């Protein structure tokens, strides 16, 4: 697995995060250092490697200030498997709900997909060539071979030849005639020239097995996986366009071309050495002694999480994985509780603390304009597909930021997410009418913003429901 991103310096990591996330420099620095320490550890001898564990991070800050986005972007920068879980979804062992080990299994699933996607990209040309060969045969089929009547193990029991149904490869066919060869040659040429992309072709694809709905979450998942492995793969016939068929067939051939066992082992190692687990809402399982019954349950979840953070060997469908060198990032608003309300052992497993700042009007302005694909740029691009050009003035952007900030102060503070609802509401009419106004140019001014939003933003009751 190519993890060249891990060799980035902390400054380079922060620079890449700055392309997508505004502010929160302290948090960016801490995650950048944590990533660099992983690279430093990889250069040590084996004995030293085993002694050095990642320094887990606890992010403290209200919703919508960038906690999850920093962790997710960081993982993407270095090509590390990343999973986000919510602490409130877990329950103590023995109760209905997700057990804490499921977060590790989910991370391994992500790691397997990452590794296999990269390995499949290396054989994509060969897989596509095989897919094109198959498409030629499907578009100009030859006669199928008849079922063989030899080498059947039941023959001796019944005293005669029994058709060997189901044992021939479904792709086996009679040698093509000269006429078919000529047709296939012509079809191959047309395929290469892209002239048949919209033509329909029938292909056989593996049917997605149905889910078992009568069991609990974890039992359901484990039983489903076991049944999928035991039962033969059922194929169904579908009629699709040639371009879609090529993708389906190429993906299937790529699966056959890569070494699945080797990919699984590589994925397990990647999860162990590079995996990042983001545990959100960890403040919700902190105990503050207000409700003793709930406190017992919350402490149970914390104590179940603790061994995972300390280092446990977890059984997955791909093999065992050790969590000792995974990086865990806890996050929470800690409005009601405090980090000190976590059990002492769990506090000790998050030695790095970082407090994220609440967002100001200036931050909202920067969020709307600075990131690589900011919200303003997103809406401009979407409406441009309808040939509608939207121009936001600087004053209008400032007015949007002021309204978002004020609504956050007057109602629930949901941080930067408020900008999504504000922009969506403001552009609702324009988005609806855009298909019927090609080549239009719309200037978004402070007056336009106020016309669309002022009556709502100044009414606290309406703001709470609409914005």
Curated annotation (Swiss-Prot):
The keyword Transport does not apply. ATP binds at residues 22, 64-69, 280, 345, 417. Signal peptide: none annotated. It is found in: Cytoplasm. It comes from the Bacteria. Keywords: ATP-binding, Chaperone, Cytoplasm, Nucleotide-binding, Stress response. GO terms for molecular function: ATP binding; ATP hydrolysis activity; peptidase activity; proteasome-activating activity. The keyword Chaperone applies. Gene3D superfamilies: 1.10.8.60, P-loop containing nucleotide triphosphate hydrolases. One of its GO terms (cellular component) is HslUV protease complex. Its main location: cytoplasm. A double ring-shaped homohexamer of HslV is capped on each side by a ring-shaped HslU homohexamer. The assembly of the HslU/HslV complex is dependent on binding of ATP. This is ATP-dependent protease ATPase subunit HslU.
